[in-house]
């Protein structure tokens, strides 16, 4: 299997730094609940670095091996209900039986939103959903990857956006 840079998803040649982005792929250290770079999902997507993480999900930079393009892969991972130790398993597990009910309801809602977003492909202001699926006892949404500034970074730089 080819080595892929977790920062930019380009194929790595021999050497310590990526010829495309200049970063050292060995320097990337994911948290214990994040997938390690190179993890494959759905026999199609290879995951790289974490792009962002919130209370209900983790978004990874990915590579769609069929379309040979970078994508963003959002994983349903509500930290209030689930955990994963990637050294042991790729599956998420709920902390409690009571949390399992809330988790399953949230996962269903996550997939429902993915279906809705996939139908909105003609709206240029909304990122396109390319695929969605369930695996590892959770759900995933695969979206087009768009380069640019995050809303968080923009508001830090320019202040609040007027309504």
Across the structure, where does each feature detected by a protein language model lie?
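A short, low-complexity linker immediately N-terminal to eukaryotic Hanks-type protein kinase catalytic domains
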Residues: 28-47
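Protein kinase glycine-rich loop
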Residues: 47-54, 59
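Flexible N-lobe loop architecture of eukaryotic-like protein kinase catalytic domains
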Residues: 52, 112, 121-125
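Conserved N-lobe loop of protein kinases adjacent to the ATP-binding glycine-rich P-loop
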Residues: 63-71, 77-82
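AlphaC helix of the eukaryotic protein kinase fold
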Residues: 83-120
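Activation-segment/catalytic-loop signature of the eukaryotic protein kinase fold
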Residues: 131-132
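Conserved short submotifs of the Hanks-type protein kinase catalytic core
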Residues: 136-150, 154
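Activation segment of protein kinase catalytic domains, centered on the conserved DFG
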Residues: 156-163
